[in-house]
A protein has these predicted regions:
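Intrinsic disorder/low-complexity detector
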Residues: 2-89, 132-211, 262-284
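Short, well-ordered alpha-helical segments
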Residues: 66, 71, 79-120, 182, ...
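Hydrophobic, ordered structural segments
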Residues: 96-150
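Short, conserved loop-to-beta-strand elements that form functional interface hotspots
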Residues: 115-127, 237-250, 271-280
């Protein structure tokens, strides 16, 4: 996975012995916020009350709300009139998302986190220029209270997960652990079907083979790339997968398919799923 060229500075004001150095490319106010949280043992979180308590119940303590962003200008790629992947657009959107994720991980790393839970990846289209898109990654950095430093991903970075606090609790109780938030995408141009009067036009009911194959291929490419990221983490599977379709600003014929989920691995051999409890409402 491509990494943006980020540097590390040897220290920052208020750094305590044994604490990791604050990444040099983080904004000044972000460094100040993270430093204050570490010094005062103060945390922020976007977890709900129930999620917060469930995360605590499985031995993790929130360290702080972490985020990363990337504003990207999407380059131009000519369209040849046939259904095909637009690789320039695919790579641009993937890199923008990756930059946002890496910066969020850097903030978590600066807090000494083991991982990030409840990750949300959003996209915003601004009016600053043509084809300008911002990706924002937000989550809650956590550390294991009894064994800090032992829950990181195989690549040495904090694990990332888009699971809710409830799903995170269930996953750990069932004998699995998250490794990383994985994603794949594909931007595809879907060539229009033959218009009425064209030799290829079929007036009766029938499958539109060209568009069907184009959409099928684009989804499969996104899924395949997501799976490749999970395999690179030595994961056994991916949970919570969602596949979305977006036009962004390119028109109806150009679609981006993105697949995201949380790569997981077994943490023990027995996988006992907690039995659900029956709750009766006293409300009428």
């Amino acid at each position: 996975m491509a990494q943006p060229p980020y540097g590390q500075q040897p220290g920052y004001p208020g750094q305590q012995p044994g604490q990791p150095a604050m990444p040099a490319d983080l904004p000044q106010h972000a460094r100040e916020r993270l430093t204050q949280m570490r010094q005062h043992h103060f945390f922020t979180s976007d977890l709900s009350v129930s999620e917060f308590l469930l995360v605590k119940e499985v031995g993790f303590h929130p360290l702080g709300l972490v985020m990363g962003s990337s504003i990207y200008h999407i380059g131009y790629q000519p369209i040849r009139g046939v259904s095909e992947e637009l690789t320039t657009l695919t790579q641009a959107l993937y890199q923008a998302r990756e930059h946002a994720m890496v910066r969020m991980e850097e903030e978590a790393d600066a807090l000494g986190a083991d991982g990030i839970v409840a990750v949300r990846l959003t996209v915003a289209i601004h009016n600053w220029g043509t084809n300008v898109i911002e990706f924002v990654a937000i989550g809650t950095a956590v550390t294991h209270e009894k064994a800090p430093g032992t829950w990181r991903a195989p690549n040495g970075k904090p694990f990332t997960s888009d699971l809710t606090g409830q799903d995170f609790w269930t996953l750990l109780h069932a004998g699995y652990r998250p490794l990383g938030f994985v994603m794949g995408n594909c931007v595809y141009y879907v060539a229009p079907q033959a218009p009425p009067g064209h030799p290829g036009y079929v007036p009766q009911n029938g499958e539109l083979v060209g568009p069907t194959q184009a959409l099928y291929d684009s989804r499969e490419l996104a899924m395949e790339r997501m799976q490749a990221e999970a395999e690179a983490l030595n994961a056994q599977g991916i949970v919570g997968v969602t596949v979305s379709e977006t036009n962004h600003t390119w028109g109806a014929a150009i679609l981006e398919f993105s697949a995201v989920g949380t790569a997981v691995v077994a943490s023990r051999e027995d996988h006992q799923i907690p039995q659900p409890s029956l709750i009766l409402s006293v409300n009428g």
